[in-house]
Amino acid sequence: MKKFMRFVVVVTCIAVLVSGVVFAGGAREQETVFINVALPNNPLSVALANLAATEYTPPPGVDIDISVIPENDLRQRLTTEASTGGTTFHMFTFGPYEALNWARFGWLADLEPLFANLSADRRAAYDRADLIPAMADSLKLDGNAYALPFYGESAFIMYNKDLFEQNGLTMPQRPTWNQLYELARAIHDPANGIVGMTMRGAPGWGMSGAPFVPMVNAFGGRFFDMNWNATVDTPQQRAAWQMYRDILVNAGQDDIISYTYNEAIALMQSGRAGIYFDATSIAPPLESAESRIAGRVGYAFPPREQHVSQWLWNWAFGINPNITQREKEAVFDFMLWATSKEFIARTMEIDPTGASTPPASRSSTYRIPAYAAVPYAQITLDVLEELDFDNPTVDPVPYQGLQYIAIPEFADIGTQMTQWLADFVVGSITLDTAIRRTQELFDRTAVEGGYR
């Protein structure tokens, strides 16, 4: 019997002939089931989709479609799918923010029964103990796993050594935001197509919000005090909002608010940007064969002011709870393959630069000699080891989260905040207006959500 995997990017379908692998308990000839997998269009997910087309063998009678979707669209579509009980997608890709909330709402399947149903050999080969604890634990509710980490990330500074040398500049290992701004202004040369510093500018709680919330934390800001009073209208918050705008307006890319991480990566790869603050998982594409600055990228710890700009995230795979048991087992088989030690080792065999290798998901990844030798490996580990997940900023807060606030409402209010941030950056509204609107929104959310 023939089985087919289709890799779908937007509207493009690629059919690939595959054969079968048995799940615990054996397999039997059955009617074909169709599994739809949703991935974000970030470099490592695209690499996974490409590799799956040639390397992954689904169970017998399984036809897998992989859809690679722009990140903001993916978040919206999967949130709608999960909250309404839809079954368009069988495998969801998300982060710890969604994992915790969706598991509580019953929007994710508990993975423990699926692990229990594996053969002893398959369980041993997967080696759950090798998953980095902080990453695996962020995907659990009451001790049970509801997702598996594909790759993890913190954040750091990436910079173009050539542009620094040409301008006689030195990057401190632990710079402040003010130091970064001055360095970016010194490099910025729009007449010659050189951008001082690039960052995400496109609105979205997981887009521009990802660097912005850690920036607020670094300036000593917080979003709620311990009594759930909104704390947006403070000098610390205002300083962060102003710094974000100053960097992008005075030393950043053109068309600021269209930039996701994909555009920022491309700009850095071209050699036309000096500094980039973003996820540690973005380093591999900068060191890839397609990058003009491969081998010429410097790395520094995330910027700080009163506090450090902390970031902890992972992209993880979970299962739609509304599908059949056979569909769940088929999805789980793909998840096990894509998060396995064998998959990681294979990515290094295919691309020894590490550009396609998922970072910060497994401890064993850093024992692969070729991976341990890549220029960003050690500093990634160092940054992860210094994270303090329970203390995102200077003063205590009633919520968790380093680049997000772990309450269900944040997907909406965080996205609205970043829209007002974008409006402020491009000059459509004043800082006072942006701060006032965000303060009122967060205060109203605390009351309506029953937090106070």
Regions found by a protein language model. Give the residues of each.
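Short, well-ordered beta-strand elements
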Residues: E31-N42, V62-S67, H90-M91, M197
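Extracytoplasmic "Venus flytrap"/periplasmic binding protein-like
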Residues: E55-D130, Q166-G168, I265-L267, G274-I275, ...
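Short, solvent-exposed loop/beta-turn-alpha elements that line the ligand-binding surface or hinge
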Residues: E112-D130, Q173, G201-A202, F219-A239, ...
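C-terminal lobe and pocket-closing loops
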Residues: A116, I282-I293, Q306-Q416
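Glycine-centered hinge/linker elements that transmit conformational signals in sensory
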Residues: E182-A186, M226-S258, P302
